[in-house]
């Protein structure tokens, strides 16, 4: 009859284990007649051991996310054209050396078309598509990282 394998806990301080402080499990395997014993050390699976093994992967993922948010940040020019418009008049301040911005002309024409504000349906599709695009990019990044971690040899 074969003797069962003895599993020691990670805190075991018996003479066979001499626990060194690292989370390991000693497994004794008795082969055949039980005269020969092989001792193997296997690492316990815990959240901290997985985090320690893949710490560089989490750091890379965090850097990629930071880079993504920095790149997707809107660019603001320091030189701009300012205009003010109400029902009684229109005023425009131009920055020195800057021609009239076509966006200002488009805004004036838009005001003439919608004097009480823009049509809310005008930019709805654009904002939805933009939000979905950013969400899809983050979802794709998460899926790629999960596939890499799960299928890591």
From Swiss-Prot:
Name the principal localization, coarsely classed.
host cell
Q: Does the keyword Phosphoprotein apply?
A: yes
Which UniProt keyword terms apply here?
Answer: Host cell junction, Host cytoplasm, Host cytoskeleton, Host endoplasmic reticulum, Host membrane, Membrane, Phosphoprotein, Transmembrane, Transmembrane helix, Transport, Viral movement protein
Transmembrane regions: 51-71, 128-148
The GO biological-process annotations, alphabetized, read as: transport of virus in host, cell to cell
Which residues are exposed on the Lumenal face of the membrane?
72-127
**Location(s), subcellular:** Host cell junction, Host plasmodesma; Host endoplasmic reticulum membrane; Host cytoplasm, Host cytoskeleton
GO cellular component entries:
host cell endoplasmic reticulum membrane; host cell plasmodesma; host cytoskeleton; membrane
Q: How does it sit in the membrane?
A: Multi-pass membrane protein
Give the family from UniProt: Belongs to the virgaviridae TGB3 movement protein family.
This chain's function reads: Participates in the transport of viral genome to neighboring plant cells directly through plasmodesmata, without any budding. TGBp2 and TGBp3 are necessary for intracellular delivery of TGBp1-containing vRNPs to plasmodesmata. Can gate plasmodesmata and increase their size exclusion limit. Induces host actin cytoskeleton network thickening, which probably plays a major role in virus cell-to-cell movement.
Describe the subunit structure: Interacts with movement proteins TGB1 and TGB2. TGB1-TGB3-TGB2 complex formation is enhanced by ATP hydrolysis.
Its UniProt domain note says:
The 2nd transmembrane domain is involved in plasmodesmata targeting.
Give the protein's recorded name: Movement protein TGB3
**Organism, scientific name:** Peanut clump virus (isolate 87/TGTA2) (PCV)
């Amino acid at each position: 009859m074969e003797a069962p394998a003895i599993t020691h806990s990670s805190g075991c301080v018996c003479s066979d284990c001499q626990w060194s402080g690292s989370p390991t499990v000693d497994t004794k395997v008795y082969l055949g007649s039980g005269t020969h014993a092989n001792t193997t050390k296997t690492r316990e699976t815990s959240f901290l051991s997985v985090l320690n093994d893949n710490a560089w992967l989490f750091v890379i993922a965090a850097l990629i996310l930071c880079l993504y948010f920095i790149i997707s940040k809107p660019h603001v020019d320091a030189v701009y054209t300012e205009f003010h418009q109400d029902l009684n008049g229109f005023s425009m301040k131009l920055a020195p050396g800057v021609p009239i911005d076509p966006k200002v002309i488009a805004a004036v024409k838009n005001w003439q078309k919608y004097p009480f504000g823009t049509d809310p349906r005008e930019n709805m599709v654009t904002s939805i598509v933009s939000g979905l695009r950013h969400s899809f990019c983050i979802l794709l990044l998460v899926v790629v990282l999960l596939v890499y971690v799960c299928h890591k040899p």
